[in-house]
């Protein structure tokens, strides 16, 4: 049987975090507990991963979330490469893990795997729920500093969040929409998974500002489509048939292509505002199918998140602000 941090913790009757602190020679472990854990490590023949068993190299883990659109995966990896070119390679190394789903169980499995490797910092984009918050708490107790990007968990023990000002992004989208339609018109709002704070807050900003601009509280329909083409297509087609005064669609997340296909051939004028300048959004913006793109620096979020941990762990530079916002910009057809 190959022993892991989890099995050592079970045998010693302590948490995984305690085992990690012992393995990494960190404080806050009583002499008795440290001796017991070290004895079990010796008895079981447990070996820490050879890549991180010696020297003073600090390992930072990056968990790449699973997206339907590879644009976001590629943008995340681009941010990792940007950071890799700037970090002090003699002091810091990066370990990247890609997810195959958005299941909480996979997040936890990858966190455990990276903890096993001895990471001192972790960058991740995850849903805002108690399961992930509890995992971040365990990582914190193990001495691992966590920085979130894109979607925050503000009530967790993460040390910092790097992302778009989501409320502002939604408000910008509402302002653009209000310039294209009448307050008497209906708006369809398509979002992904409301468990992700990035999806939830952006929609809140959009709807709140629409009401401030004179639109009624009942002017919209909301569809949670999990960034799936089929669900988005059906939601748009259904809204077109049910709401004769539907003249605006806000795509708070993907799939923009499904929205474009659903409104193809529609006789009425349709204003479409989307987030993120994906290849599909760029093509549809050029064609005039969509009107505005509210863009965020996705690669920059990952880059900055890694660099926050780099500065903290390699040089002891404390995090000054709990939230760092990247720039938000508006893209029109004329800018392409």
Q: Can you say where each PLM-predicted feature lies in the sequence?
A:
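Amphipathic helical "hinge" segments at domain boundaries
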Residues: 48-109
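Conserved beta-strand elements of the Class I
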Residues: 61, 186-190, 247
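N-terminal helix-turn-helix DNA-binding module of bacterial transcription factors
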Residues: 1-56
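Flexible loop/hinge segments that line or gate small-molecule binding clefts
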Residues: 129-168, 278-290
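Short helix-capping segments at alpha-helix termini
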Residues: 86-90, 142, 210-217, 242-244, ...
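Hinge/beta->alpha junction and helix N-cap segments in small-molecule ligand-binding domains
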Residues: 65-71, 95-106, 128, 162-172, ...
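Hinge/cleft segment of the Venus flytrap/periplasmic-binding protein
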Residues: 210, 297-336
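Hydrophobic alpha-helical
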Residues: 121-138, 206, 224-281
């Amino acid at each position: 049987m190959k022993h892991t941090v989890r099995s050592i913790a079970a045998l010693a009757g302590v948490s995984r975090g305690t085992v990690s602190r012992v393995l990494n020679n960190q404080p806050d472990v009583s002499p008795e507990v440290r001796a017991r854990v070290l004895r079990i490590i010796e008895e079981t023949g447990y070996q820490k991963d050879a890549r991180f068993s010696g020297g003073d190299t600090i390992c930072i883990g990056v968990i790449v979330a699973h997206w339907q659109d590879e644009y976001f995966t590629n943008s995340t990896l681009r941010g990792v490469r940007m950071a890799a070119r700037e970090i002090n390679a003699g002091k810091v190394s990066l370990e990247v893990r890609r997810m195959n789903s958005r299941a909480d169980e996979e997040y936890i499995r990858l966190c455990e795997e990276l903890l096993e490797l001895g990471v001192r910092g972790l960058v991740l984009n995850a849903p805002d729920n108690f399961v992930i918050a509890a995992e971040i708490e365990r990582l914190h107790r193990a001495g691992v500093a966590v920085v979130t990007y894109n979607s925050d968990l503000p009530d967790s023990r993460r040390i910092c969040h790097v992302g778009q000002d989501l409320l502002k992004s939604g408000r910008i989208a509402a302002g653009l929409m209000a310039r294209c339609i009448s307050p008497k018109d209906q708006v369809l709002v398509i979002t992904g998974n409301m468990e992700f704070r990035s999806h939830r807050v952006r929609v809140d900003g959009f709807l709140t500002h629409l009401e401030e601009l004179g639109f009624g509280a009942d002017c919209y329909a909301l569809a949670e489509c999990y960034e799936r083409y089929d669900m988005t297509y059906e939601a748009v087609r259904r809204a077109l048939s049910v709401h004769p005064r539907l003249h605006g669609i806000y795509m708070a997340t993907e799939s923009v292509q499904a929205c474009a296909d659903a409104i193809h051939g529609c006789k009425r004028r349709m204003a479409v505002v989307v987030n993120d300048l994906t290849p599909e959004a760029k093509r549809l913006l050029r064609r005039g199918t969509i009107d505005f793109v509210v863009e965020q620096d996705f690669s920059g979020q990952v880059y900055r998140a890694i660099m926050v941990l780099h500065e903290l762990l390699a040089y002891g530079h404390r995090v000054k602000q709990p939230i760092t916002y990247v720039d938000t910009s508006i893209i029109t057809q004329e800018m392409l």
